[in-house]
Amino acid sequence: KNIQTQETNFVPPYESEYFDGPFDETGTYTTDDYFARVAGNDRKVDMAISRIPIPTPEMGQWIVEKIKRYETESTHGEWQSTVTLVADDGLTTLTDDGTEHTQGSEDLAIYSIPDDMQKHKVYLAEYPVENVPNGRRKPAVTAQLLNEVNTNGSVLLSWVGHGSPRVWAHELIFERETTIPQMTNMNKLFFLTAATCDFARFDDGDHQSGAEELVFSKVGGAIGVFAASRPVFSSENKQIAALFYKFLFTRGADGKYLRLGDIMYNVKQERNSLNDEKYFLLGDPTMRLLFPEDIVRIDAINGKPVTDSVPMMPL
C-alpha cells in the first residue's frame, strides 16, 4: 500500500488500496470497522470499538492517568453543561461555502443539542479579518476559542469546517503546534467532534495528527475525539455528526448517558458509507462524558406537596 515508516504498528487498521485519480485522497480510506464485522455479510459493525494510537509505553501510562483524572478529579461546574460550537466561514464571498458550515453548526445547536445545555458559539463569519503576508488570519477567533476552553470550559467542543491533520480553516484559527500547548484545561477536558477532513489521520507513522496530540496533551486538551482519518464531504459530515450528538444525549435503560463505545456502535448501525467508515473514536469506549447527572424535581412549595390541588377564587 506504499506505506513506509520506521515505527511499529501493533494494531494496524484496515487500509484501502491506493487510488490513483483526480480524487485520490477521498477515494482512499483507513478503518477499523472492517475488523468489527464478525456476523453476517452486511456492512454494520457487530461490536463497539475505538482506538487510542499510543506511541510509547510512557504515553500509555499517561493516557490511563489522564482518563482517571477526568473521571475523579474534574472540576464540577457550568462547563459540564456547556457546548462550544466553532464554525468555518468561506474562503471567499463568491460561494455559499461559509454559510454551509455555519448552518451545519446551527443545525446541531437547534436539532441535536438539548435546550438545557448552554451553547457558546464561535463563528468565523462574525470575526474581523487581518491580512498578513502569509494570508488571511482571524486571531480573535483563536483567542475566543482558548477562552472558551481554558476559562469557561466545555464538556463538548464542536468544529464544523475545513481542516487537515494540523490546522482548522484557511485562517489557521487552530494550529497543532501552537494552539494545543495553550489549552491548559486539565480539570475541564472537552470531548471534540470534528466534522472536517483528516484531522484524525493517525496512521501516518511519521507525524501525529491534531486529534492525537489533543488526547496526548499533558496540560489539557481533549479526553477523546470523534473525527475522520481522511478527506470527507461536508454534506455527509453533517449527517453523521447529527447522529453522533443524538446518541450523546441519549440515556440508557439505567437512566445514565451512553458510553462512548455504545454511541459509536449505534452511529455505525445507521451509517456505514465510505465517508462514514473514515470516522474514528479516539478514546476510551467505556467512558461516559461528565454531563450533569443530577435531576431536580419539585415535590413541595412552602411545605405543600405539588400534587395538592389549589382552589381558585372567582374573578
Regions found by a protein language model. Name each.
Residues 1-315:
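Cysteine-dependent hydrolase recognition
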